Structure formats: C-alpha cells, structure tokens
C-alpha cells in the first residue's frame, strides 16, 4: 500500500484517482503509524511553498518525512512537494525540508521561448522532459516524453541530483533525487499514459523494496 500525505496543501484526491485507476492500493493519511507502515509515500503539493511548510511543521509531518528518508523508505514528491524537499524556496522566503540540497527559484518573465517571445509565468501546460541519467521512475517511458506542468518556481539542485530536465525560458530540473527518493516538478497524475507509467514504476519499486526487507 502507498500512503498519500495529507497536509491540507496537496492535490491528494487527484493522485488517489490515478492510483485507483492503476489498481494500486493507497490511502490519504496524516497518521505517522500508517505512513511508517506503507510501502512508500507520495508527497503531493499545490499552492505556495510557505503555506505548505507551515502546514507540515504545524502537524509535525515535516519530521515524519525526514524519518521516512532516514529509514530509507521510498518517497515521491510532486510539484510543491518536489520543491520543498530542497533546502530553500524563493517563494515566501521559505526554509524548506532540506531532504535534498538545493533551492527553488522563480522563473524570470524576461526570459524568452524558442521563438524569442517572453515566457508566461506560471509555466502551464504540456512540455517535454529530457532524461539525463537512468532512473527507475522512467522505465518504459520514452526518453523525451511530455508531462503536464503548472508552476512559477523551479527546483535547482546540484547537478548530481538532476535526473531529467525541461526547457522553459531556461533549462531547469524536472526530476531530481536518487534511488528511492525522487521529486518531480510536473503532475504525473495529470500527465496521461507517461504519468501513469511513472506512478506504476514508483509502486513497483516500493513493492520490491518492501519484499527485499
């Protein structure tokens, strides 16, 4: 079973629908014992980084997430969840979880697209990602598949954590992390077949990791 973190700042319901469609057992929860007992945790998020961190700290779920990582249990951050897994976000001048090094930066509206026109902020819609290194999440997904993005800020971790990139005014990190600890800036639950495959890959990894223990 997968646990979808419930901290009043996420898109938990849409993630659950996607997992239900795949036939993957899941529960939306804020219960530390349920989270600890799950094969893996999905950490979704929408809205502002400051508000999301405030909810995590208020509920104590920030420490639950850190313990999840320290114990080596699988974690997948989505959108704002992806951003606040880093050390810091420029949005609301937010000190984040510090699970993965790096910061989250605002897109510069003066940047231009391939045609020389100023980009619109937020970055909203389908865009192609480019895989930079092998990743269990991307097994069976075309190397330059398109996913659905909605965000004004983008993650900027050190190069060694960058798994895939996307270009929107600048090349930015679309997936970061390492084995069992991943963060995706796009919304896999809204990304059609590639997104569903990514979620299925995460579940498979979690199940295999749990069976190996």
Curated annotation (Swiss-Prot):
Reaction catalyzed: 5-[(5-phospho-1-deoxy-D-ribulos-1-ylimino)methylamino]-1-(5-phospho-beta-D-ribosyl)imidazole-4-carboxamide + L-glutamine = D-erythro-1-(imidazol-4-yl)glycerol 3-phosphate + 5-amino-1-(5-phospho-beta-D-ribosyl)imidazole-4-carboxamide + L-glutamate + H(+); L-glutamine + H2O = L-glutamate + NH4(+)
An annotated GO BP: L-histidine biosynthetic process
SUPFAM superfamilies, sorted: Class I glutamine amidotransferase-like (SSF52317)
Segments passing through the bilayer: none
Pathway of action: Amino-acid biosynthesis; L-histidine biosynthesis; L-histidine from 5-phospho-alpha-D-ribose 1-diphosphate: step 5/9
CDD domains in UniProt: GATase1_IGP_Synthase
Keywords recorded for this protein, A-Z: Amino-acid biosynthesis, Cytoplasm, Glutamine amidotransferase, Histidine biosynthesis, Hydrolase, Lyase
EC number: 4.3.2.10, 3.5.1.2
InterPro entries: Class_I_gatase-like, GATASE, Imidazole-glycPsynth_HisH
GO molecular function: glutaminase activity; imidazoleglycerol-phosphate synthase activity; lyase activity
GO cellular component term of the entry, any: cytoplasm
Pfam families xrefs: GATase
Localization of this protein: Cytoplasm
Domain of life from the UniProt record: Bacteria
Active site: 79, 187, 189
Domain Glutamine amidotransferase type-1: 1-212
Cited HAMAP family: HisH
PANTHER family: IMIDAZOLE GLYCEROL PHOSPHATE SYNTHASE SUBUNIT HISH (PTHR42701:SF1)
Assembly with partners or alone: Heterodimer of HisH and HisF.
Function text: IGPS catalyzes the conversion of PRFAR and glutamine to IGP, AICAR and glutamate. The HisH subunit catalyzes the hydrolysis of glutamine to glutamate and ammonia as part of the synthesis of IGP and AICAR. The resulting ammonia molecule is channeled to the active site of HisF.
Protein name: Imidazole glycerol phosphate synthase subunit HisH
